[in-house]
């Protein structure tokens, strides 16, 4: 008896909460569900399109900037809390 979550064809979705930092514009919608198999680069590209800016700094939990090749599910499993992965973004460097 297989459940949907154990099926290889099902992809776990991760809630990504995007939070503006510094003078960055606030998005109208701040929470998104994306497939966990996606790379973090997809989140970065999405933010660049939404903000119409190439200058973008992203941080997980206001602490560190992950490698764009990291999978979203790995970041969520290690740094997510309250059922979501918090990603802070800024147009200029916010944290060293």
Curated annotation (Swiss-Prot):
<keyword id="KW-0813">Transport</keyword>
<keyword id="KW-1017">Isopeptide bond</keyword>
<feature type="modified residue" description="N-acetylalanine">
    <location>
        <position position="2"/>
    </location>
</feature>
<dbReference type="GO" id="GO:0000045">
    <property type="term" value="P:autophagosome assembly"/>
</dbReference>
<feature type="cross-link" description="Glycyl lysine isopeptide (Gly-Lys) (interchain with K-128 in ATG5)">
    <location>
        <position position="96"/>
    </location>
</feature>
<dbReference type="GO" id="GO:0006914">
    <property type="term" value="P:autophagy"/>
</dbReference>
<keyword id="KW-0833">Ubl conjugation pathway</keyword>
<dbReference type="InterPro" id="IPR007242">
    <property type="entry name" value="Atg12"/>
</dbReference>
<dbReference type="GO" id="GO:0015031">
    <property type="term" value="P:protein transport"/>
</dbReference>
<dbReference type="GO" id="GO:0005737">
    <property type="term" value="C:cytoplasm"/>
</dbReference>
<comment type="similarity">
    <text>Belongs to the ATG12 family.</text>
</comment>
<comment type="function">
    <text>Ubiquitin-like protein involved in cytoplasm to vacuole transport (Cvt) and autophagy vesicles formation. Conjugation with ATG5 through a ubiquitin-like conjugating system involving also ATG7 as an E1-like activating enzyme and ATG10 as an E2-like conjugating enzyme, is essential for its function. ATG12/ATG5 conjugate has an essential role in plant nutrient recycling.</text>
</comment>
<keyword id="KW-0007">Acetylation</keyword>
<dbReference type="Pfam" id="PF04110">
    <property type="entry name" value="APG12"/>
</dbReference>
<dbReference type="InterPro" id="IPR029071">
    <property type="entry name" value="Ubiquitin-like_domsf"/>
</dbReference>
<keyword id="KW-0653">Protein transport</keyword>
<keyword id="KW-0963">Cytoplasm</keyword>
<keyword id="KW-0072">Autophagy</keyword>
<protein>
    <recommendedName>
        <fullName>Ubiquitin-like protein ATG12A</fullName>
    </recommendedName>
</protein>
């Amino acid at each position: 008896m297989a459940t949907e979550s154990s099926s290889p064809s099902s992809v776990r979705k991760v809630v990504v909460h995007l939070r503006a930092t510094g003078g960055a514009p606030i998005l109208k919608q701040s929470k998104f569900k994306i497939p966990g198999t996606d790379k973090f680069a997809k989140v970065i590209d999405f933010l660049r399109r939404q903000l119409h800016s190439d200058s973008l700094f992203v941080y997980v939990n206001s602490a560190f900037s992950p490698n764009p090749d990291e999978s979203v599910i790995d970041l969520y499993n290690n740094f997510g809390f309250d059922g979501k992965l918090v990603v802070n973004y800024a147009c200029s460097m916010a944290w060293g």
